[in-house]
Amino acid sequence: MCLDQAMEGSATVHMAASADKVWDLIANVGNIGRFSPEVFEAEWLGDASGPALGAKFRGHVRRNEIGPVYWTTCEVTACEPGREFGFAVMLGDRAANNWHYRLAPSDGGTDVTESFRLSPAPWLGVYWLFGGFLRKRRNVRDMTKTLNRIKDVVEAG
């Protein structure tokens, strides 16, 4: 991995549910603890009370499901009901990691793709050398878990 490359990955799961129903679950960040293996709660910040471009929320993370535990501040970067929802994990005023959900009608249901993109940074190459490649694999596995948990809820009714 070069220093100017991003680390990224994605997972897709088909859900026998409408895109609007899936989007409503995903875009309500209060639900994140029900689905994510690492983020166990989230709350809107400031005047934000729901999904909107530029809205901020805080996510409470238990890294690798065991720790360390920390808060992240996130900003909504994509918000189109029934189609996409995305947010950036902020490091100060800079997006460090971007998470995105894209919903596409398919076979009477919805294909839901979750992706992440860790922004290029000088430290990323060093991180990769010291095990960052394992993080990519972990993220893809956790995105698949997250999507399957969402699938279980939307298909149950």
Language model regions located:
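Hydrophobic ligand-binding cavity/cleft-lining segments
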Residues: 1-49, 149
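Generic structural detector for well-ordered beta-strands
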Residues: 12-16, 43, 60, 75, ...
